[in-house]
Amino acid sequence: MAAPRVAGRTAKRGGALLLLCAAAFALPACSGSGYQYVKNGSDGSGTYFKVPDAWRIYDENAFIKSRNLSPTKAKAARAEGWTVAFDASSKPSLKHFNELATKQPFGIAEVRTLDPKERDEFSLMAMRNYFVPVDDLTQTGGELVPLRADEFTRDGGFHGLRLTFEFTLPTDKEAITVDQVSIVDAGTKEVHFLVVSCSSSCYERKKDTINNIVDSWTVKER
């Protein structure tokens, strides 16, 4: 399985199609492949990924509103980065963000500026624990099964970690599978993060689609 891509200054094969398809926030794939592209950026740079046409995409405003943040915190969240959510459920809801063992895949894509302290400390361990505190889970009795841990580097100094794991909380009988990728730039100024998760039985049924989504996570140098 291919590692998530980071496009450097030189166009990669298929890059022209991706740029054309990703000219807006979300629109159907140009080739009629059954996927729609989501993009952060408007000048040919930024972060791209694709999800199936039938999945619901929640833009940044909808996602932030669902978090019930104060006006000050909501403004800060917008200033720090970009976040969208997506849901495969036939009854999509941002409430699924708070449900780990969803019956259908649910995901988050985020681009966030790291503060000076985070830049000094951001590491593979930070990438591993970015969405779910994996290390804490194993120390508090949670059962965790690693399925994939692929480190990678790309042109322009980008590097990252693709991590897939299954876990069960001590208080829960249902296993959850998380498939995530973190990419940081050479200066460790921004983290580009994508995660898709659902119950492990759901993941087994949908793993090919989920893999297509995570593999499509592309960062183009600004």
Where is each model-derived feature located?
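Surface-exposed amphipathic alpha-helical segments
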Residues: 55, 188-222
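Bacterial N-terminal signal peptides that target proteins for export
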Residues: 1-18
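C-terminal motif of bacterial Sec signal peptides marking the signal peptidase cleavage site
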Residues: 26-29
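Proline-anchored loop/turn motifs at beta-strand termini and strand-loop-strand connectors
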Residues: 44-65
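Bacterial signal peptide processing site
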Residues: 31-34
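Conserved polar/disulfide-associated segments of primarily extracytoplasmic proteins
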Residues: 62-186, 191
